[in-house]
Design a protein with these regions (language model features):
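Glycine-rich flexible loops
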Residues: 1-127
């Protein structure tokens, strides 16, 4: 739902996959790919979780982070009274601005900063 600025970042990039039980059936791989399609980078796996695809690990990570934030915002908003959606032209504008501004380096700055933070905390994530 295009409810928040964070949610608008991914307008038209989200696909949905029906829950099929535990992911033990290899045939589900084909359906996941079909639901992702050619133009989607994110999947909401109904009754299960989220999946993101990126050109790089930092891109996939940051898209997952903001998709999760958008979901949290939506759940919190829907728990209250009636939600107010931005006008369709504003939704399109925000999405276009985000896509133009992200470029090919999406997530790199954040990912590098997170790795530095882990190193400072003494994490052995890289071993």
């Amino acid at each position: 739902m295009p409810l928040s600025q964070t949610g608008l970042l991914y307008k038209d990039l989200i696909g949905y996959h029906e829950y099929e039980g535990l992911a033990l059936n290899l045939d589900e791989q084909k359906r996941l790919v079909e639901d992702l399609g050619k133009n989607k980078q994110l999947l909401i796996l109904k009754n299960h979780g989220l999946l993101t695809c990126g050109r790089t690990i930092p891109e996939a990570f940051i898209m997952m982070y903001y998709l999760e934030q958008a979901c949290k915002i939506q759940i919190a908003a829907q728990a209250g009274n009636e939600v107010s959606l931005p006008k369709p032209e504003v939704q399109d504008l925000v999405h276009q601005q985000a896509m133009k501004g992200f470029g090919s380096k999406l997530g790199e700055m954040e990912f590098i900063a997170l790795k530095r933070r882990l190193a400072r905390l003494g994490s052995d994530y890289a071993s």
